[in-house]
From Swiss-Prot:
The chain crosses the membrane at residues 33-61. Disulfide bonds: none annotated. Keywords: Endoplasmic reticulum, Membrane, Protein transport, Translocation, Transmembrane, Transmembrane helix, Transport. GO terms for cellular component: endoplasmic reticulum membrane. Its main location: endoplasmic reticulum. Gene3D superfamilies: Preprotein translocase SecE subunit. This is Protein transport protein Sec61 subunit gamma. The gene is SEC61G. It comes from Gryllotalpa orientalis (Oriental mole cricket).
Length: 68
């Protein structure tokens, strides 16, 4: 019985901690959500442009290397 308790106790403690965390968390209000959404969209755009420009620079370099 002691071995079963040793096996189950970490899962039980994790579930208890998870429930406590979810109860303490609150949903963001509309203003906070919009701020987070805009920041995420700006980040996606910046990463997209960086990827685009890296690809744009590497295409001619690749053609020079392969074309030789």
């Amino acid at each position: 019985m002691d071995q079963v308790t040793k096996f189950i106790e970490p899962g039980r403690q994790f579930a208890k901690d998870s429930i406590r965390l979810v109860k303490r968390c609150t949903k963001p209000d509309r203003k906070e959500f919009q701020k987070i959404a805009v920041a995420t969209a700006i980040g996606f755009c910046i990463m997209g442009f960086i990827g685009f420009f890296v690809k744009l620079i590497h295409i001619p370099i690749n053609n020079i290397i392969v074309g030789s």
